[in-house]
Amino acid sequence: MLTVHKHVEGELFTDSTVQDATKGSWINLVNPDPDELAIVNMMTQIPTDVLKAALDTEERSHVEIEDEYIFVVINIPVLRGSDVYDAVPLGIFVTEDFFITICLEEAEVLYPFLSNQMPTFYTFKKTRFLFQIMYRTAVLYLRYLQQIDRRTDDIEKKL
């Protein structure tokens, strides 16, 4: 799924088509199909194989700096069921015109941005947006660690 978001006069708008994407837009890809990857490739000149790299479940966190883009991969926490925790890679591309996120599944880390709950979030402030995503990732990890700690304490008390 490919969605395009952009701040206009302080309001976050979701554009209906990728053709509406303009400078300062955020392109969010969730489990993209080959056609969506090709569209993003045409818009940004990011090679398709690099876009696909972010979809590799074994991809480790790293940063790549190229002439036309910066590619950041971070592992984000995922809760599967009531007590099964995992981490999946989230790829973030920063180009001159666009901010692109790509993940195999819906990322809880991005919900506050998609629902416009972050008061200081703007799609065109790409560095700030990157740091805000990293901060939200840390907050989620801490929340999940606290849940694990509470469950561990409960189990230890029962023993």
Predicted regions located by residue number:
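Peripheral, non-transmembrane regulatory/ligand-interaction domains of membrane transport proteins
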Residues: 1-159
